[in-house]
Amino acid sequence: MKVLWVALVITLLAGCQAEVEPEPEPEVQLGREWPRWQGSQPWEQALGRFWDYLRWVQTLSDQVQEELLSTQVIQELTVLMDETMKEVKAYREELEGQLGPIAQETQARVSKELQAAQARLASDMEDVRSRVAQYRSEVQALMGQTTDELRGRLASHLRKLRKRLLRDAEDLQKRLVVYRAGALEGSERSVSAIRERLGPLVEQGRVRAATVGTLASQTLRERAEAWHQKLRGRMEEMGTQARDHLEEMREQLEEVRAKVEEQGSQMRLQAEAFQARLKSWFEPLVEDMQRQWAGLVEKVQLAMATGPTSAPIENN
């Protein structure tokens, strides 16, 4: 994997770091159509907005002249610069985070080269803003005089800056693409290497786990059987104790029933004896009352029988 990264870096350095000799600048044509900057990454889209705005500024139309005098162009260029560099930094940090699997010295070199490319792009954008600000100052100094020469010089400078900006942006773009591809491939290689190293260990662990699982299942089965036997013995013991308790309770109930019957018999005998005693108490009294009553009835009858015969004798 280290060899792969060395090859990628050498290829990139050969294609991107070579200094391009400046070619003679042709006569600037205001309003000339520029190639559009294209890209799908957020930083590329932000740079595309800066690129389009710079193309509009280079037209040096009447509206551009008015906004240059009011510093609006400089302010908008500053906002677009900050937005672009913010997106570039975020994307670079994301890419550096994906370079974990590569060697440390390679990662440091890649990070240093990306930061240098980012700094060149920022310098180009700063030069554009500085040149526009300088043009604004010069126009204000020549207020009321012709500014055609200044406009031509600004257009020429913007053309040079635009070409340098395009070159450095493409250089950064190529570096990011190459390093991202290398990071992805390095990650895949690292994952494959880790999988190859861990494969035997995983298989060994699986076999060991299966062996341990078998022994554990045997041990658990033996323990379960012993626990079952122990539980069954305990249940039988509890059943025997329960039967003994039931038999003991049945005997106690029989004793209680016998005692109740015995007490019932005794109470019945006592009641009969008490009844006989009452009878012996009241029978003489009843007989005596019957005799007295019979005597009284007899006296009354005798009195009634003698009453009619004695009355006529007294009248004579």
UniProtKB/Swiss-Prot annotation:
Keywords: Chylomicron, Endosome, Extracellular matrix, Glycoprotein, HDL, Heparin-binding, Lipid transport, Lipid-binding, Phosphoprotein, Repeat, Secreted, Signal, Transport, VLDL. The keyword Nucleus does not apply. Residues 277-289 are annotated as: Specificity for association with VLDL. The gene is APOE. This is Apolipoprotein E. Belongs to the apolipoprotein A1/A4/E family. Residues 1-18 form the signal peptide. One of its GO terms (cellular component) is multivesicular body, internal vesicle. Residues 157-167 are annotated as: LDL and other lipoprotein receptors binding. Residues 265-316 are annotated as: Homooligomerization. It comes from Tursiops truncatus (Atlantic bottle-nosed dolphin). Pfam families: Apolipoprotein (PF01442). Homotetramer. May interact with ABCA1; functionally associated with ABCA1 in the biogenesis of HDLs. May interact with APP/A4 amyloid-beta peptide; the interaction is extremely stable in vitro but its physiological significance is unclear. May interact with MAPT. May interact with MAP2. In the cerebrospinal fluid, interacts with secreted SORL1. Interacts with PMEL; this allows the loading of PMEL luminal fragment on ILVs to induce fibril nucleation. Its main location: secreted. InterPro entries: ApoA_E, Apolipoprotein_A1/A4/E. It comes from the Eukaryota. Residues 79-254 are annotated as: 8 X 22 AA approximate tandem repeats. APOE exists as multiple glycosylated and sialylated glycoforms within cells and in plasma. The extent of glycosylation and sialylation are tissue and context specific. It is found in: Secreted; Secreted, Extracellular space; Secreted, Extracellular space, Extracellular matrix; Extracellular vesicle. One of its GO terms (biological process) is negative regulation of long-term synaptic potentiation.
